[in-house]
Amino acid sequence: MAVNTDLPVLSTGLAHLVAHESYPGHHPEHTRKEVGLVRRRQWWEESIFLVGTPQCLLAEGLADLGLEVVMGRRPEAVVASHLAPLGIRYDTEVVAAVSEAGEALGAVRQNAAFRLHEDGADSDTVTGEVARWGLLSPDRAAKAVEFLTHPTWRAYLTCYVEGLPLCRSFVHGDPARFERLLSEQLTPDVLQDQIAADRARSAAPAQPV
């Protein structure tokens, strides 16, 4: 696991970073699919991870969901108990508020991608918009726009913004479904179909006994 240190890693996102990149996020997904799909089933396509594909949408979505799966929607108290002995400042109320707002504000960066690549807005203008509407410091806004203008990664942000709500709706609090994300060859359409079926069942009138 490599951590980008161009900007300081904030304590507010430390637990999410660990869960996303290691366990139960990217690392177990790659290892379980390597063993279950590539070695056992010989589905060689699973040995290749292509950027900007539906595979990435699910990979980033499940990784972003990882902390929530193991600690629930409000993990701050547990995280604080681990960080306090290390002398890392971690205000649970602030982190909870930032987490809620931060997820919603993720759409600001996705809109910034459209501003850059569809509207033709210049980087300086979009950096200012990301700082203002995304509630980011100028340095972090500039880093976000740098990511959005990179030839390889400029569309990748969609994997985070759209992947998390899709995977969360699919898992719906069921660890067995999260295990499916880690282990099976799924597509966004498969998840959408399951979500639609779940909603249809919940909306169906109860049958008389």
Where are these regions (language model features)?
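Long, amphipathic alpha-helical stalk/connector segments used for oligomerization, subunit docking
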Residues: E60, L67-F147
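Flexible glycine/proline-enriched surface loops and loop-helix/loop-strand junctions
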Residues: P8, W44-L50, E93-V94, V108-R109
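Active-site metal-coordination segments of metallo-dependent hydrolases
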Residues: I48-E60, A101-G102, P151-Y160
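Post-HExxH zinc-binding segment in Zn-dependent metallohydrolases
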Residues: H30-R32, G36-L37, Q42-H82
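Flexible loop/turn segments at secondary-structure boundaries
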Residues: V9-L10, P24-G25, T31-G36, P188-D189
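Catalytic glutamate of the conserved HExxH
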Residues: L17, E21-H27, T31, G61
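Short pre-active-site segment immediately N-terminal to the catalytic Zn-binding motif
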Residues: V3-A19
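C-terminal, non-catalytic "cap/extension" segments appended to globular domains
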Residues: A131-V209
